[in-house]
C-alpha cells in the first residue's frame, strides 16, 4: 500500500484476513486501500466493519469519517466523528477532521474543535494548520502568526507548509503591521498572551521604514525575542519562542527567517542569499534536520 499499488494490497489483505479475520490493523489497511483507490462503496463496507468493533480505535473513526465525507454523506460523517470524539475526546486528528467538516458546512464553531485539539493534543499539527487559516480571515492579528509558524516547524517539508509560509508573510503585511497602531481592533482580546505579544511587537514598529520584508522581519523578530524574554517569558513559557531564542544563540536566526519568509517573498533573492551566506545556511539546515519540533502540554494561552 505504501507504494500506491492498491490493487495488489487489496489482494494480499483479503487473503491474509481469511487466515486472521479479526485482525484490526489489516482491516484498517483494507478499508484505506479501497479508499485510496476511490472504491468508496467497498471502503464503506469495510469502515462499517471497523466501526462495529468493540475495540475500534480513533483511526477507525477517522477512516469512517473520511469515507462518508468522500461519499458526501454529511450527516453520517458527522455522526461518526461525534461517536469517535465521545470515545476519544482528546484525540487531535478527530478534532481536526470534525472541525474541517463543520467548516465546510460554514459552521464557524469549527474553531472550537481546533482550539481544543491544540490544547489537549498539542503534538498534532493539523489543528494548528486549520486554526491559523481560520484566524487569518478574522480581525485577530496574533494567532494566525503563532499557529502558522508552529505548523510550519512541525510539518516543514509538506506542500501545506509552503502555503502556510505565504500566509505568514501576508499576515505580517496585511494584518499585524497594516495599522501604525498594531493594537487597533484588538481591544476586546481576552488573552493576556496576545496582549503581551502585541506589546513586544509594537515596540519594534520603528524598524518598518522600509516596509515588511524578510530583512525587516528578521530584525523585528530578533528584538521581539529579546523583549519577550526580558518581560514575559517567565509568565508565558512558550516552545516556539524558546526555539527562536535558541536559533539566535546559535547564530542561525537570520537563516531561519530567510527559510520562513524569503522563499515566498522572492525565491531568486533567497537563492542569492543562501549562496552569499553558505555556511550559516548549511548550519541552519543541519540544525533543523537534527530536531523534531513539538509543542508540549501546558502552554495554551488562547483565552477566547
Regions found by a protein language model. Name each.
Residues 2-3, 36-37, 70-71, 103-105, ...:
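Register position in tetratricopeptide repeats
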Residues 6, 40, 74, 107-108, ...:
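TPR-repeat structural position
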Residues 9, 43, 77, 110-111, ...:
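Single-residue signature of alpha-solenoid repeat helices
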Residues 15-16, 49-50, 83-84, 116-117, ...:
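Canonical positions in the second alpha-helix
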Residues 21, 55, 89, 122, ...:
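Short coil turns that delineate tetratricopeptide repeat
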Residues 26, 60, 94, 127, ...:
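TPR alpha-solenoid repeat register
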Residues 29-32, 62-63, 97, 130, ...:
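Canonical tetratricopeptide repeat
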Residues 123-304:
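Eukaryotic alpha-helical solenoid repeat scaffolds
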Amino acid at each position: 500500500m505504501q507504494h500506491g499499488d492498491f490493487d495488489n494490497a487489496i489482494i494480499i489483505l483479503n487473503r491474509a484476513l481469511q487466515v486472521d479475520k479479526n485482525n484490526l490493523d489489516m482491516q484498517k489497511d483494507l478499508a484505506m486501500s479501497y479508499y485510496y483507490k476511490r472504491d468508496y462503496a467497498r471502503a464503506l463496507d469495510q469502515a462499517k466493519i471497523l466501526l462495529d468493533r468493540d475495540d475500534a480505535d480513533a483511526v477507525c473513526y477517522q477512516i469512517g469519517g473520511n469515507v462518508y465525507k468522500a461519499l458526501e454523506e454529511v450527516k453520517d460523517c458527522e455522526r461518526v466523528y461525534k461517536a469517535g470524539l465521545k470515545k476519544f475526546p482528546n484525540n487531535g486528528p478527530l478534532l481536526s477532521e470534525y472541525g474541517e467538516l463543520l467548516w465546510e458546512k460554514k459552521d464557524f464553531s469549527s474553531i472550537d474543535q481546533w482550539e481544543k485539539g491544540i490544547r489537549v493534543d498539542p503534538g498534532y499539527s493539523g489543528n494548528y494548520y486549520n486554526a491559523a487559516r481560520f484566524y487569518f480571515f478574522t480581525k485577530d492579528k496574533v494567532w494566525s502568526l503563532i499557529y502558522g509558524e508552529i505548523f510550519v516547524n512541525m510539518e516543514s517539508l509538506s506542500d501545506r507548509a509552503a502555503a502556510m509560509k505565504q500566509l505568514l508573510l501576508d499576515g505580517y503585511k496585511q494584518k499585524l503591521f497594516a495599522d501604525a497602531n498594531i493594537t487597533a481592533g484588538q481591544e476586546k482580546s481576552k488573552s493576556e498572551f496576545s496582549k503581551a505579544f502585541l506589546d513586544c511587537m509594537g515596540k519594534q514598529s520603528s524598524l518598518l521604514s522600509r516596509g515588511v520584508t524578510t530583512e525587516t522581519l528578521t530584525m523585528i523578530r530578533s528584538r521581539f525575542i529579546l523583549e519577550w524574554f526580558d518581560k514575559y517569558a517567565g509568565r508565558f513559557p512558550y516552545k516556539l519562542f524558546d526555539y527562536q531564542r535558541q536559533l539566535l544563540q546559535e547564530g542561525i536566526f537570520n537563516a531561519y527567517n530567510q527559510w520562513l519568509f524569503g522563499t515566498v517573498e522572492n525565491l531568486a533573492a533567497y537563492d542569492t542569499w543562501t549562496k552569499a551566506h553558505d555556511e550559516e545556511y548549511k548550519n541552519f539546515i543541519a540544525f533543523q534536520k537534527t530536531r523534531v519540533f513539538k509543542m508540549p502540554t501546558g502552554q495554551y494561552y488562547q483565552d477566547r
